[in-house]
From Swiss-Prot:
Function: This protein is one of the two subunits of integration host factor, a specific DNA-binding protein that functions in genetic recombination as well as in transcriptional and translational control.
Subunit text: Heterodimer of an alpha and a beta chain.
Protein name from the UniProt record: Integration host factor subunit beta
Name of the gene this protein is made from: ihfB
Annotated family: Belongs to the bacterial histone-like protein family.
Keywords from the UniProt entry: DNA recombination, DNA-binding, Transcription, Transcription regulation, Translation regulation
Renumbered residue ranges of the record's region Disordered: 59-82
One MF term in the entry's GO annotations: structural constituent of chromatin
UniProt cross-references to Pfam families, sorted A to Z: Bac_DNA_binding
A single Gene Ontology CC term: chromosome
GO biological process, one term: regulation of DNA-templated transcription
HAMAP family linked to this entry: IHF_beta
Length: 103
């Protein structure tokens, strides 16, 4: 699901709200979450999960074109840990066998 699809679905489900208001709410929420993470804060949404930053230490990488070793600096990356309710909901989904698909 894309952000546009999410906005469209929410606008349909909340018919009393204007589509522009739903668009603004979703974009504001995502902006605030991004800002909180960039400030080093943790975001916890009970039943859904939590967003935090994990530190990746410096490491030695490799340039795929030349095979040359390259020093990569340490960095913080966003991390999502699903909550219990979300994990249980997702685990009940029957997995799709991708080997049966034909193009």
């Amino acid at each position: 699901m894309t952000k546009s699809e999410l906005i469209e679905i929410l606008a349909r489900r909340q018919a009393h709200l204007k589509s522009d208001d739903v668009d603004l709410a979703v974009k504001s929420l995502l902006e605030m979450m991004g800002q909180a993470l960039s400030d080093g804060d943790r975001i916890e949404i009970r039943g859904f999960g939590s967003f935090s930053l994990h530190y990746r230490p410096p490491r030695l990488g490799r340039n795929p074109k030349t095979g040359e070793s390259v020093a990569l600096p340490g960095k913080h990356v966003p991390h999502f840990k699903p909550g219990k309710e979300l994990r249980e909901r997702v685990s009940s989904v029957v997995p799709v066998d991708m080997s049966d698909t034909t193009d």
